Amino acid sequence: MDIYQILVTYNKPWSTNEKIAFGLLLLTIAIILLFALYWKKLSKRQVIASFLLAVFLSIVFESTIFTRVVSTRKYELIPFWSWKAIYQYHDWELLKEDLLNCILLMPVGILLPFIVNNEFSWKKALAVGVSISLVIECSQLIFMRGLFEWDDIIHNGFGCMLACLCTNRLIRKYKKD
């Protein structure tokens, strides 16, 4: 399955109710962030980064949970099972899926240092990525909308952490120049 097919398969069109809920959620977040800016609790950069994070996470949750078709409860509880299958069976589609899972939460890792307006530790970034992924995976299991697997949680957390490390390094380099 190529990236386009993955996007088409897992990103079904949103219903009217989903669009309204998404819009109301973002409007509420925007109002709260604007008040925080007005009261000088957050800088413009922090407000923009926080709003971008809210938009991104809304889209991620929508595409990984809410727009998926209900099936049966599926789970894979063996960590790194996908890497074993990739190595053993040369399953390149599974490798692509693992890499895409690493990429999925990279935008979160990029935004974290801007939200806190400072460097964000890699341990905290890993914890944030794992936490977000755990919510996604548990929701998929509870609502029967996908496969719960530890590999996704590990890959998502790793991607978030890696992106945060790179962003911290770029910010440090930019501040030196």
Please describe what each predicted stretch is.
Residues 1-145, 150, 164-177:
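Bulky hydrophobic segments
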